[in-house]
Every structure is written in structure tokens, then in C-alpha cells.
Amino acid sequence: MDMNENKVRKKRHRITVVCTNCKKRKSKCDRGKPCSNCTRIGIENSCLYIKDTPSLPIDSIGSVADLTASELQIPNFIPIHPSYNKEYVNYIPNGRFFEIKRSAYTMFPIFTDACIEHRDAVIKAFTTFRTIVVKKTIDHYRKTGIDIERIALAGSQGLPKSFLPLTVFDEESSKNLVLEQQEPQQSYQIHSLLAEKFSHYRKNANLKLGDDSTTVYHNLIIKSLPDLGLLMDTIIPYYEQFIEPLVPIIEFKDFNVEIQKLYAKIELSNSLDPKIGENTLACIILLICRLCHLSSKFAVEKSINSSNYESILNMDTNIFVSLVQRTATGEKPLRKGTLYELQLLIMLRLCYWVGPDDGDGQQVEQSEILHGAIVSMCKHMGVWWDLVKYSEDSDLFITVDYKAVPKLGSQSEYIKLFRKIWCYVLCWDRKMMLLTGQECEIGRSYKMSPAPRFGNGWCDDILQYDYLLYGINNELHDDARKVDISMLEELVEMSEMRMGVLKEDDFSSNIYREQKLSLMLMKLNIIHGQLSWYERTGDKQSQETAYAKLFTLTVELGSKCVEYFSTPGIPEQRFYMNKIYEVILNRLNNVIVPGLILRIRYEEETGLDGMVKYLYGMSSMYFNEIGKEYYRTFKKMFHGKINYKILENGHRCMDMIIKFLQREMQNNNDTAVSKGDSMKLSDRLPLVAWDSNSTNDMFEPIHTVPRGPEIAALILEMVNVSDRYHYNNNVFQTVYKEARLVIDETTTTSQQDSLASAGTNRTNNIATNSGSGDDGGNGSDDSYLMRLIQELFDPLDFASAF
């Protein structure tokens, strides 16, 4: 009998499909319709099953050894089904967001906080309400004759003018404390010390050299270099062990030889020769010292034996980045590039990212130009896709001049180093796309089969799924008004699965963790954009599904943050990992969680109270773990506290906010929301102005908190986080809690009494007061406003902050 005529097809006699939600969550599915998992977390409406693809004959595929490279390739872990109904989401419903200021012209990436607030009508109404209430409160106190602008601490002079008023935190009695006798943890309670510390950061960042000659500048670099013995015996080994696995851009065998030559030259002539890159090499050494110092500083908090880092911590590296900036951007026009110059730009980019002094800006966007310069220099130097596409033996040819610096020896050594640098720059390019929605600077990718392996660890691994990340970029940026959400979710899921099978070693594990967290944050941003769009289109069923997904992913990300700050991990790499958790907590604490709370039904008091406590726990962790060291976080502490007070004290909060804004549109529509703003309030919030007689349906809180033991446990975990921080040492609890105006001696007793009692009379039903017209616009607006504010805040909590 001809065997080909009787091919046996493999048949399955059991159900093998699982619902799409369980597949995403990698959970065991009971195959119900809906399954118990989806029912438990409240997303049963999205519990869907995909039919199996037709089975293949068993003997139609031979052994693995018989397969060609193209047959071995697995194009997708999840098959793309052309039969799905395409669904499009507009991620810029209010248009692309530009900001023009004296200091910078900026188009914000679509997943920055600014763009999320611009896109989300609920959050935009909330933040506008907050701005108006605070501004009017301060205007009210100006009328009392108190000179608020005069109240500023001497230590704040290094901060921007917009930040000066935020430095007045302490009650008057704190002036008498002997700071030298405070315990380190207790000293954090004195918020003025934090402001003073951050002012020093900014002074170092804006360092002025006086005589700006090259000679003076080079002499300062030479003076800042560490002792050769300390550098070679302590700093370089520390960097190689803990930091180089994260930033594999230097070949230290040859680099150490160049260091010895540089120090010998300095000892003879005490000068630097830019023609042979000595100034650039010296600046690379300074940045290595800076990174090691930051690493040691954050490692000490989690290490038992701090003496291991003593020699590195004793270095003063605060001005090193300022010194390097001139060499990186000022001494030589960006027309040609060398290896040292490329390495210097990459390390400067890293220092901006991990530094506590806000090198990347409030929206994590200010290094985009520097990143573009890095990518352009890579392309100019040949550090590009060609290095991984082509064979080293037959397709790549390098000539090395005898005067080249540094001289690595053979062609293969250059190619190996260039490949690592290229993969690192590629990884960074895709990471920023995932975190902020920034369009990729590297506008190309390749699906390689088999994926090339060059013995470079994680640098090789990212090549396996880069085409998927680039696909996400294209789907978002081809037309942000019309994003195929099914295809976008498919690409994200496939990327997650590819990352999930990668092997990790000890010191590169944080790179994989960072990539996975970045992808989770991208998922969060995608789902949030869906929710905002469904609210605009009135699709209630899709709203419920998106809200449940957003809620679940939010508490999962929050749990990962709790885990990170509860375990030491690799202490020497916390300086690097802190940033990704800072970005996540910033997004959750300032945008996502307030938006979730504002959308919860008023009738669900238990769920609402639980999420307000969740926000308090998250804020305590965010500002205590990160806000004490990072300027970007510290600067957001005031708005974080006001957000919490609004959500904590406001019964029927969203209803009250909309009525307040509609009232403002009727009475003060032309008044600027903030200084220099010429836009009318009704133009800023067109959806709120759509019907001034009744609340728009899209602002009606209709959602319930998803149920289930897993979600409840994750919420409780975050609620209990605040117990870690003693009441008096919880920066989030104490900030603006005990603040007092420094009242001039000429202030009358009656004025002081009125200030002291301003926040004592509170009622629970804010919606009733805000909706009443008795105090209408005929001369009684001030009394109406102040009653509303008194119900929300103790004005002293923020009068001292503006």
C-alpha cells in the first residue's frame, strides 16, 4: 500500500483552546463561556475564543534536521488571523500636543503625562479644576495683604522661579532645630533641606567657569580626574563588574592601556590634546566616576557593609556632568565622529537618565535631541544594521590608520565592539518608544532567521524581537488618528512572549526586567487610550472592558513596584533600575490612578474608599522611596498631595468638578487658567462646555472596581505599604500638612485668626453646595468659592506653596 495515500492526520480529542484573556495573562483556563477567571476579575464580556487552525499531516514534516532556515523560523507565537474585524482608535482626539515656551519648543510624545492629560477628558477636567482652585485661593490670600511672593527660603536660590514658592514647607518652630543633631531619617522630615539639596543639583548643572578659555577648562578637567591608583584598582573594576553589563560600549582591555598613556602624558605636560582625543578620554573617565558614585550611593541603602563603597563615595562628582557637556557639545562641531566621542555621548545620555537632577525633564523628553545625535553619529561611523546583517568574513571590510585612537588591533575587534554599541543604542531607541510613545529614531528593522548570535549576551537577544517593537512603533505613528488596535495588541503580545523565553544571567537580568516593565507600561498606555476613545464614542460595553483591563494592569504594575522596593536585588544596579520604576510610579500616581478613582460609581463606596487608600499607599512609596533623591519626583509632590486631598475629601467628586467648571465658564470664561494662557476655559474643555445645563454623559462615573481575591490582595498590598513609613517620617504625609505662612509682625490679629481657622468648617455634601445657585455670580462669588475650598482643603496646606 502506498503510504502517501493514507496519511494519518493528527486529531485532538480534547478541548485545547483557551480564552484570549487567559492566554495574555498566562493563566489556567477552565474553558467556560465565560471562563471563571474572566468572571472573577470582571471582564467576562471580553472572554473570547479563537478557533484552532487546521491540523497538519503527521508525516508532512520531517525531522528538525531536515528543515531549512526559513522553515525553522517561527514568525509568530500567536497566529495573525486576517478574519478579525478591524477596530480603530484615535490616540490624538484633541490633536498633537505642542508647547511653546521661552526655553523650548516641544512636541510631546503621545504617551507622556502631558499628552495623556490632553487626551483624557476626565483627567483634563480634574487638573484644570485643581489649577483654578489653587490659583483662586492664592488670589484670595493676596487680598488679605500677606506678601506671599516674599516668603522663600534662602537655600532655594538655585531652583527655577516657578519652584521658589514650593520650598516653604516647615512650620516656624522647625527653624530652632539643631540640624546637626537630627538622625538622617528624621532630617528628611524637614522639607527645606530637600529643597536646598535640589537647588545645589541645579547649581552644579548650570556651572559657570568664569574664564571660559579652553586652557582653564582643560585644567579643571585634569584637576577633577581621580588618582590613577584609585581609578585602576577600585573604580574601573567596580564599573566592569556592575555597570558595564548594563552599558556594554567599552572594551576595557584596550581602554586601560589608553588610560595609562593619558595619565603619563598629563604627568609630563599637564595638558590635554584634543587632536588625539585626550580631552574626550578624560571626560569618559569622569563619567565612569560619576556612574560609579551614583551606583555606590544607592547601593549603600540596601547593603549591609557600606565600607565596600567608601573610597568611591568620598569622591565629589557633582560637577562632572557639567564639565563633560562642553566637550560633548561645544568644543567640536558635530560634523565628524570618533569612537571616543560616540562613547562619550552615550554615557552622557545615560547620566542624564539615571541622575537625580532631572536631566530628562518633567516629561522624560528633553534628551531626544541628544539621542538623535547619537543615532546620526552611529550611522555616520558605520555602527548600523550592516554589522548584524552582513558576514564579518566576506561582507565587511575595515581599514585602520596607524594613528587611529583607540587602536583595537584587528578588524574583528572593531566589529565586535561596534555590534555591542549598536545593539545598545537600538535597545535605548525602542525603550523610549515604549515608555513615552516617542517615534523611533532608527527607522528600520529586520526579521532575521535564524537570529544572529555574536556572543554578546542580551545585546544579541534584542535582535530576536526588534522587528516586533518596530512594528508597534509603525502602528502608532503611521497615523495616530487611526490605529488598528487589534494589530497593535497582537504585536505587544508577541513581544511579551519573545521576551518571556530569554535567558538571563545575574548582572544582565535588570536589562530584561527593564524591557518587560517598559512593555507593560506600553500596554497600560494603549489600554488607557482605548478607554478615553470609547468614552468619546459612547461605547459603554467597550468602556467596561477597557476599564477592567486598565485597573487590573495598574494593580499588577503597582505590585511590581512594591516588590522592587521591598527586596535588595543587585544593590549596585539600583541607580539604574530606580528610573524605570520612577517613570512607572509617576504615570500611575499622577495620571492613571486618579483617573480610575474619578470613574468609579458613587454608589460603590467600599471600592472607592479602597482605591483612595491605594493612592495614599502608592504616594507614600513614590515620594518616600524616590522623592527624597529625584528632583522630578520631588517637584510633583505638591500636586500629588492636592490630588489626594481632592479625591479623599470630595463626595461625588466628578459631579462637583464638572459643575464648578461649568460655573466658571458662565462667570469667568475669559480668565486665564494659568499665567500667560490666552485660551478660554470653554475652548480648553469643549466637552465640559458641550452642555452647560447638565453633566455630559461621558463624565458620569459608571464603573465598578473589578472583583476577585487576586485584585483584592494586590490592592491591600499597596494599602499596607504606608505602614512602612512612620507617620513623622512619611514625607507624603507631612508635606504641606503642618506648613504655616511666615506672617509679618504687622499682620493684624484678626487676619491671623482668620487664616488659622480657615479650614475648620467642613461639610460632607460638597455637591450640594457646589450645585446651589444661592451664592451666584452677583458679588458673592468669593464666599461661594471659599466655602467650596474649605470643604476640600485646609487652605494653609497650600497657601504657603504659592
Curated annotation (Swiss-Prot):
Entry coiled-coil feature ranges: none
Pfam families on file: Zn_clus (PF00172)
SUPFAM superfamilies associated with the record: Zn2/Cys6 DNA-binding domain
Keywords: Cytoplasm, DNA-binding, Metal-binding, Mitochondrion, Nucleus, Repressor, Transcription, Transcription regulation, Zinc
Keyword Metal-binding: yes
UniProt cross-references to Gene3D superfamilies, sorted A to Z: Zn(2)-C6 fungal-type DNA-binding domain
CC terms in the record's Gene Ontology section: mitochondrion; nucleus
Compositional bias ranges of the Polar residues kind: 749-768
Regions recorded as binding DNA: 19-47
Any single biological process term in GO: positive regulation of transcription by RNA polymerase II
Role according to the record: Transcriptional inhibitor with a significantly increased number of target genes in response to oleate.
Protein name in the entry: Oleate activated transcription factor 3
Species this protein is from: Vanderwaltozyma polyspora (strain ATCC 22028 / DSM 70294 / BCRC 21397 / CBS 2163 / NBRC 10782 / NRRL Y-8283 / UCD 57-17)
Gene assigned in the entry: OAF3
